Curated annotation (Swiss-Prot):
Signal peptide: none annotated. It comes from Jannaschia sp. (strain CCS1). The active site is at K13, D131. Catalyzes the phosphorylation of the position 2 hydroxy group of 4-diphosphocytidyl-2C-methyl-D-erythritol. HAMAP family: IspE. Belongs to the GHMP kinase family. IspE subfamily. ATP binds at P94, H95, A96, G97, G98, I99, G100, G101, G102, S103, A104. GO terms for molecular function: 4-(cytidine 5'-diphospho)-2-C-methyl-D-erythritol kinase activity; ATP binding. It comes from the Bacteria. This is 4-diphosphocytidyl-2-C-methyl-D-erythritol kinase. It catalyses: 4-CDP-2-C-methyl-D-erythritol + ATP = 4-CDP-2-C-methyl-D-erythritol 2-phosphate + ADP + H(+).
Amino acid sequence: MSAATFRGYAPAKVNLALHVTGRRVDGYHELDSLVVFAGVGDRLEIAPADALSLTVTGPRAEGVPDDARNLVWKAADWLAPGRGAAMTLDKHLPHAGGIGGGSADAACALRGLAEIWDVDVPDGAEALGADVPVCLHGQPVRMRGIGDVLDAVPPLPPMWIVLVNAGVEVPTGAVFKAMERVDNPPLPAPAWDGFDSFLVWLERTRNDMESSARSQAPVIGMVLERLRALPGCRFTRMSGSGGTCFGLFETEIAARDAALGLPKHWWVTYAPVLRA
């Protein structure tokens, strides 16, 4: 293969807290979210080519488009219309699962294509999706606005996360439509100095989309109950617009044992929360 081939990693994006604080006149929702990344994700390989192509492989490839409907393809068209590249996406994250799989893939594609094509990634990546700028940033951050305002947060304490999806896809538009209000209070100022104080801070936050997502997919409530009952699970919540849920654990052993105790027909994985 060409020495110019790019191989990149697209880690899962997790909204540990997600407040919906308003709706703009153009229809976009204003968000305030603590976003982190987990040590599990998709992989993307890009090689120079005359024409643009996308091959989707991996254990979560079913149902993922391999054409212009895919955010990876859209990222290429947005960055440099008409340029060619052969892209292979190895899918490990659930499609439409609320953990930014498509956005993380698009961000990885932008980095790789910029390298292959020797171009810069311009501002405005939120045009591809609200989560794309934060996935380009790739570090723990407070995300506000329509995903375009990124603020630094205190260093995260070491922790592990168990991610669970019971096989449900929850359309983001339907979740927003089902919300009773979209003018909720913002996040409290991020402040913590260890795992326990971080959990205290999290308890003061919400996912404003969780209730409406559960009305669309009641199994989300079942997943959260199963997570809460696991030994060592210190905090549970739904990520993004659903339907992936998470549990936070202090140690790898606790997270691993918890993951092993969940139904085998669900998508379940455990990983460290990436601190930088």
